[in-house]
Design a protein with these regions (language model features):
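Alpha-helix-loop-beta-strand connector modules within alpha/beta enzyme cores
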Residues: 59-90, 143-145, 190-205, 259-275, ...
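Active-site mouth loops of central-metabolism enzymes
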Residues: 21-37, 86-107, 134, 148-160
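Conserved, mostly hydrophobic/aromatic
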Residues: 45, 65, 175
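Iron-sulfur cluster-binding cysteine motifs and their immediate structural context
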Residues: 109-131, 141-158
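Non-catalytic positions within long, well-ordered alpha-helices that form the structural scaffold/packing
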Residues: 46, 117, 167-168
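N-terminal amphipathic alpha-helix/helix-capping segment at the start of soluble metabolic enzymes
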Residues: 1-29
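Conserved mixed alpha/beta catalytic, RNA-binding, or beta-rich assembly cores of soluble enzyme
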Residues: 39, 51, 57, 144, ...
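Extended, intrinsically disordered, low-complexity segments
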Residues: 15, 304-350
């Protein structure tokens, strides 16, 4: 590993980054299966210094993530953890949009195509009508946009019987488990499946928030303590991901407030373990966090939608040239510069 000229935190181990408040995670998307884009994103953000990359429990996705990490490691980057995402039930992160394009009226202005941040809908973006499933990561913005109500969501939750074998085959460093209020039993079942895999996890991240629930912050804290008891009994080390406004970081400054507001309400009573922000995070998150009295207790941040949107124009330009972004000697330095602008403030955080 060559750390010359790099921020201090890009040379820290993931555990050291968590302990020092400089942890940065890249979220590829729990339902994202756009393999070419995933490989490019993981290569660029690994070289930029992220400590962890989170993706779908899918062999092809994991292979793409590892190819990107290998590319960056060959250029002097530290190797980030591979984290895989699961849910203990239905969850917006684990869904795909779907509709029958034959039912779409010819005169429809197709607002679904304009609001899709993944460019997963329509002929112009994908070369085919309908939704390109591998690109869709379940943000849900197309659902209310359709004037005819034709778009539906299809759940992508992994069956419990498949979890142990898949994890044993994929060998992640960590797992993220999305949970919702009242799902303590389902959460415990997932934890049992993780133990049955035999994989020695560095951390088990628990992702939870208030978006789409009627819960109060104290009720969420109580749920987290319940999850903590289960994790401790199972021998897992927790990482708490407070999910402000899921899959919205590309929308602008306002989305960053949700995660900061959530952490301000939950952190003082949170169970032991590092706390990381997610859900609406972007370049505005850290400046907003600096006004928070307990900011030094925050372990770090995860970037998802904003990271993907940031590099999207360059990914498309490389695609138009018939090559990957990592293979384009002109474009990949530009992409690396953009990625570093996003992650360096956290890597250099004091």
């Amino acid at each position: 590993m060559n750390c010359a000229g790099s921020p201090l935190s890009s040379c820290l181990t993931p555990e050291e980054a968590l302990a020092s408040g400089r942890w940065v995670k890249l979220i590829c998307g729990a339902s994202n299966q756009d393999l070419a884009a995933i490989e490019d994103l993981c290569g660029i953000f690994s070289l930029a210094g992220v400590h962890c990359i989170d993706g779908a429990v899918d062999a092809a996705v994991v292979a793409a993530i590892r190819r990107g990490i290998d590319w960056a490691e060959a250029r002097g980057a530290s190797r980030p953890w591979l984290m895989l995402s699961l849910s203990d039930g239905d969850d917006p992160h684990f869904r795909k949009a779907w509709f029958d394009p034959a039912c779409c009226p010819p005169a429809c202005p197709r607002p679904c195509e304009r609001v899709c941040p993944a460019l997963a809908i329509g002929l112009a973006a994908t070369g085919a009508p309908g939704v390109l499933a591998e690109r869709c990561y379940g943000c849900g913005r197309c659902l209310p946009a359709c004037p005819h109500g034709l778009i539906e969501e299809r759940s992508q939750v992994l069956a419990g019987v498949d979890v142990p074998l898949l994890l044993a085959q994929l060998r992640p460093d960590a797992v993220e488990l999305h949970t919702h209020p009242g799902r303590g039993v389902a959460f415990a079942e997932r934890v049992g499946q993780l133990r049955a895999s035999g994989v020695q996890l560095r951390r088990l991240a628990v992702s939870a928030g208030l978006e789409g629930t009627a819960q109060s912050p104290p009720a969420l804290v109580a749920e987290l303590w319940q999850r903590f008891t289960l994790l401790r009994a199972a021998g897992f080390r927790p990482l708490w991901q407070l999910d402000g406004r899921p899959m919205s970081g590309d929308l602008g400054a306002g989305t960053a407030r949700a995660a900061v507001k959530l952490v301000a309400a939950v952190l003082p009573q949170a169970p032991p373990g590092p706390v990381q922000l997610a859900g609406g995070t972007n370049a505005h998150t850290l400046p907003q966090l600096r006004s928070y009295p307990l900011q030094n207790l925050i372990a770090g941040v995860a970037f998802g939608g904003v990271a993907r949107r940031l590099l999207q124009p360059l990914l498309l330009e490389a695609q138009g040239r018939g090559r990957s972004l990592l293979a384009d000697a002109e474009l990949f330095p530009l992409a690396l510069g953009l990625a570093r602008e996003l992650v360096n403030p956290w890597l250099e955080r004091t």
